[in-house]
Amino acid sequence: MSSPTSTPSRRRNKRGRGSNPPTPHGEEVQSPPSQRRRTEDSTSIGELLPMPTSPSGDVQSPSGQELLFSSPAPSRHSAHQSELDLSSPLTYGTPSSRVEGTPRSGIRGTPARQRPDLGSARKVKQVDLHSDQPAAEELVTSEQSLGQKLVIWGTDVNVATCKEKFQRFVQRFIDPSAKEEDNVGLDLNEPIYMQRLEEINVVGDPFLNIDCDHLRNFDQDLYRQLVCYPQEVIPTFDMAANEIFFERYPDSILEHQIQVRPYNALKTRNMRSLNPEDIDQLITISGMVIRTSQIIPEMQEAFFKCQVCAFTTRVEIDRGRIAEPSVCKHCNTTHSMALIHNRSMFSDKQMIKLQESPEDMPAGQTPHTTILYGHNDLVDKVQPGDRVNVTGIYRAVPIRVNPRVRNVKSVYKTHIDVIHYRKTDSKRLHGIDEDTEQKLFTEERVAMLKELAAKPDIYERLAAALAPSIYEHEDIKKGILLQLFGGTRKDFSHTGRGKFRAEVNILLCGDPGTSKSQLLQYVFNLVPRGQYTSGKGSSAVGLTAYVMKDPETRQLVLQTGALVLSDNGICCIDEFDKMNESTRSVLHEVMEQQTLSIAKAGIICQLNARTSVLAAANPVESQWNPKKTTIENIQLPHTLLSRFDLIFLMLDPQDEAYDRRLAHHLVALYYQSEEQMKEEHLDMAVLKDYIAYARTYVNPRLSEEASQALIEAYVSMRKIGSGRGMVSAYPRQLESLIRLSEAHAKVRFSNKVETIDVEEAKRLHREALKQSATDPRTGIVDISILTTGMSATARKRKEELAQVLKKLIQSKGKTPALKYQQLFEDLRGQSDAAITKDMFDEALHALADDDYLTVTGKTVRLL
């Protein structure tokens, strides 16, 4: 590290190479005498920005070598602040950007990285508290007195006082209402944020998240200033946090200076209630991310070079505008400055579209959306489908009349510069496969969950805790519980065997009013990445993806649908039978391959859709007809039904004893107290933690005994139908048994699938087949109803009828043409069983397929 006693001329030349950012109003900060004299003596281009709010000076090291952003040795503590530039809140930048080992470092062409989420760096005029005029030089005797007398123009923020208050908050605040599960690994009797700084020193992640609720409880005036003037106050917080950190850990090395990120602002606004009074204030809104753009490079500092004399200068961006130098300050040539892109400094930027959460929407309204801009480290932190609480600064920018003309309209468009994301939803399960959402469990919580898993009746207790307001349907609840746990995801693509899905698909079908939609709503409100849609109100592109023109870039972009948004979650589809054919056809690939192939408008890609499908369907005749098969009742293609692991019937039994028990249960929901309800069922928070822990940390594998049991189960299922000449099981049924067995092992927190898991999977699968794949004429389970759409007995009857019809035609002699109606009546007359017109048509088509006859209009012609 260079010595602070280097010659002033070298220091001035180093600093003078860049030009200062323009002020919004054209004013400059009043300098203290020591710095003003240094500025007057300077012969370099530009001016030295004063630092009235902090003893640290904005003075760069004169060394030609770059420096690491670390604290100096303890013996040189006096030089610490002048060398490191812990960032002025008025000319805000990160000192580490000119150092080695940090992004975009090395060449002077990559200067100080500012925080784009707070807006660009700018000079801020300070005024005397007791005067309308700017502070005069003769009134200022020292930097300390300046900090005590002045506030930032347009605000009531005194930087020295603000910094002192925040340092006191960080060093002293202890949250009396803190919960251990929310502060894992922290001592709740010690200052919370000092422990957070210690974490930064250990981990090296230079971000300090501040709960605004803590700040409000500690100092309401400081909290008010933060909400009203975030662009001025947050840099002051940054400076205070860095001073505390490097005084405590002088040898620490960070990527860049610590950035304070406040969240949980009390000024939490509904997206609809944002109005002009919130502009440039700190707000918190919640919603669901529906689209994220690609990473956009945004210029932070422009590098200009004179084409005549090769003089260079830098211009910092102010609110998205570049003040291009019109005259070269060295040779006074006009319009000779050219922008050098590879010497300019850029930052990462991403546009995120946030949609209003369904629970925040008023009745009968369409959801509102707003645009977010994430910068640098906040890029790619959220994905479409995430539910987030966003803390940021509400901005308004004018709209240009024409992109090529600088004239602007009087109408402004708004966006939010993101400062903090918080992906938490207390009502839902904790997410999986996402580092930011993985639930951290305390040792006590894990011990309690493992103790719960050791109980022999844990499977029944968890199933009873699922939708306790819905009466009975125990097997259906157990099936949905296994769907929530899911199987083990296996990838054998390196051996050429491909990937095997772990998601369980379930279809509920039956009479109206049997709580099918209630179960779907319960699951939707429980899972983190769930989507709820209705079959009648969904289109094929709404479920998959569609191409639209980006309003910002005017380019064609892919907008994802419900199935892609519910990746790693559950997609609940109600009114499944009312979906049109084109919409249902897109589900075939999703439910088996777990991917979605798109080829639209020149965009060809394959999206992940690793989602479980929970669907509900009503019968065509509004009431289940026991004389018809499942296919005939709900009119769904057998190719789609065969992809469901479990198909349950929810029928109204029309039994007086059942009706009495159901009525007693419904009435009890109204008169029982909450304490009684809690005693009967498992706590909802425990259920969510239990499922989240199992999905994250338990990955069961098949044992030798379980493998043999699965083989025997599959072979026995095949044997059932072999004697009658029909197929009663397919490989898909075996894969379903494996997934259900793995899910049941997860319920027990077991990393090995045992025989008891296979037995329960067999029982549940058999119960579902008894309901959905039973031939109504014979009462025998026939899996071919779901796989081919026709039972074996129906197929046999069709063949027999075709043979009878063939004999009837042969008995009529060599007649080339027969009347359709006459032939039908003759067949009905000689048959003992009732023959419908549909059966007659099927027999004719069977003979036509054998090239025996052809049907033309109302005439049957022999071939």
UniProtKB/Swiss-Prot annotation:
Protein name: DNA replication licensing factor mcm4-B
Subunit structure: Component of the mcm2-7 complex (RLF-M). The complex forms a toroidal hexameric ring with the proposed subunit order mcm2-mcm6-mcm4-mcm7-mcm3-mcm5. The heterodimer of mmcm3/mcm5 interacts with mcm4, mmcm6, mcm7 and weakly with mcm2. Begins to associate with zmcm6 at the neurula stage. Component of the CMG helicase complex, composed of the mcm2-7 complex, the GINS complex and cdc45.
Single annotated GO MF: zinc ion binding
Native organism: Xenopus laevis
Domain of life: Eukaryota
UniProt PTM comment: Hyperphosphorylated during mitosis in a mechanism requiring cdc2-cyclin B and other kinases. Undergoes dephosphorylation after exiting mitosis, existing in a partially phosphorylated state in the cytosolic interphase mcm complex which associates with the pre-replication complexes (pre-Rcs). Complete dephosphorylation inactivates the mcm complex, preventing its binding to chromatin. Becomes actively phosphorylated during S phase once the mcm complex is assembled on the chromatin. This chromatin-associated phosphorylation occurs during the activation of the pre-Rcs and is independent of cdks.
Family assignment from sequence similarity: Belongs to the MCM family.
Residues reported to bind ATP 1: 497, 643, 732, 735
CDD domains: MCM4
Domain named MCM: residues: 458-667
